[in-house]
Amino acid sequence: MEVYIDKECWDKIINYAKAAYHTEKCEIGGMSVVTQDKDGDWLIQEPVILKQEIGGTTCDLDKEELAKYYTQMAIKYNKINFRFCWWHSHHTMSAFWSGTDLSSIDEYGEGESDLSFALVVNLKEEYKCRVSVWKPVEIHQDVELNI
């Protein structure tokens, strides 16, 4: 299984991160849809930012906006095998999984999700990409992102 993101979507996430840092000196986060192709590989696409509270080292997505987003994407992608990717920035820090990040990732395992993706980027365009399998057993693996 490979994870891909096209250059346009990658640049969009990086530009969101740069804009948040240059205007607010803050992190920013958002969501993307991840679709599976016929070979079993996954493509991160359509990165968006949602209403959120941002700070120097945190970004908290609005739960109501997140629920609306999940519903809209479920309708749009109802005939395609898809999952979600939570992405966020660490601006001038390294790309790593903080304790807060790991807690946020774990929230996906509390619901019905069997598989989820997470991506953290920084202004140097470094990243960590994690695939989390929740069922039948819990496994987390940081993987290479093919840009």
Predicted regions and their residues:
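Conserved beta-strand-loop surface patch within small alpha/beta domains used
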Residues: M1-C85, T92-I147
